[in-house]
């Protein structure tokens, strides 16, 4: 079976790295994620990753608690840097060559984000992990995923979550909630479905960049998507 995609952008939330823990990085969880990523890399699909920081610090929560929102967002960006380094290290142990590029400069630790370099590294078979979101406060890492996916020419944004797609309501709170197989960007925005923020949806819509929402906890889901199988929910123009 041939690959459905040549280049994809995977969005991982920081919360997904916690596993069953209340905080931080669960090593077993990150190793399982890397095993799924390794399968895709072996198929020959070029993979970029945008990673969140909510397992360490959430800028929105810091702002709500009385901290200056911009300061809180910068702290959240630093949290994504820690997650990116942890993910890169786990990939190295699994034999995957990966590079971290950051929207905030920290030259002794990671490369700065340079678009042509990122594209070249993808073409050479490396996984590129984008850290520090967009580098600007008030923008989520979901928006960073939409932005970087557009910049590097990804064919789809793969949004890994704890649920297996986009639902009409929160399935944990509403047992009658139904999962969409496909849904348009305009419909997702108008219904205020809280899977990605409206800015990310709007950017992907304008760039005609589809989003597939799937469960990170479902073994083999990432590989099945890359092979073109129906998994999760496709958000499209």
Swiss-Prot record:
Coiled coil: none annotated. Pathway: Pyrimidine metabolism; CTP biosynthesis via de novo pathway; UDP from UMP (UMPK route): step 1/1. InterPro entries: AceGlu_kinase-like_sf, Asp/Glu/Uridylate_kinase, Uridylate_kinase, Uridylate_kinase_bac. It comes from the Bacteria. GO terms for biological process: 'de novo' CTP biosynthetic process; UDP biosynthetic process. UMP binds at residues 53, 73, 134-141. It is an enzyme of class 2 (transferase). Keywords: ATP-binding, Cytoplasm, Kinase, Nucleotide-binding, Pyrimidine biosynthesis, Transferase. Its EC number is 2.7.4.22. One of its GO terms (cellular component) is cytosol. ATP binds at residues 11-14, 54, 58, 161, 167, 170. GO terms for molecular function: ATP binding; UMP kinase activity. It is found in: Cytoplasm. Inhibited by UTP. Its main location: cytoplasm. It catalyses: UMP + ATP = UDP + ADP. Homohexamer. Catalyzes the reversible phosphorylation of UMP to UDP. Belongs to the UMP kinase family. This is Uridylate kinase. It comes from Burkholderia cenocepacia (strain HI2424). The lineage of its organism: Bacteria, Pseudomonadati, Pseudomonadota, Betaproteobacteria, Burkholderiales. The gene is pyrH.
